[in-house]
Design a protein with these regions (language model features):
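Domain-level signature for soluble enzymes in the chorismate/prephenate branch of the shikimate pathway
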Residues: 1-96
Length: 96
């Protein structure tokens, strides 16, 4: 069972890296949200979202990963980003 334990450790390390990368992504998107709020740009950019999903679906297919899974994951991520951008915008409006 040592091999199972070793493989699970590898999975745990990868999961940790995924969470760290998502955190980094959100830090950057927070900056984008602030720029959008300062420039009165809408939080939601449907064309950009579609571009991201399409690019990641292609990437996932090239890596033999289910593109529907990747779409689902990133739609959740993007939904959280838009919600955060709205909160950033609303915070700015409350200070004016």
């Amino acid at each position: 069972m040592k091999e199972l334990h070793t493989l699970r450790q590898q999975i745990d390390e990868i999961d940790d890296q995924i969470v760290e990368l998502i955190s980094r992504r959100f830090l950057i998107t927070d900056e984008i949200g602030t720029l959008k709020a300062d420039s009165s740009v809408p939080a939601l950019d449907e064309a950009r979202e579609q571009e991201i999903i399409s690019r990641l679906r292609e990437k996932s297919e090239s890596l033999s990963v289910n593109p529907d899974l990747i779409s689902s994951i990133f739609r959740s991520v993007l939904s959280e980003v838009v919600a955060k951008h709205e909160r950033i915008k609303n915070q700015g409006e409350n200070f004016m």
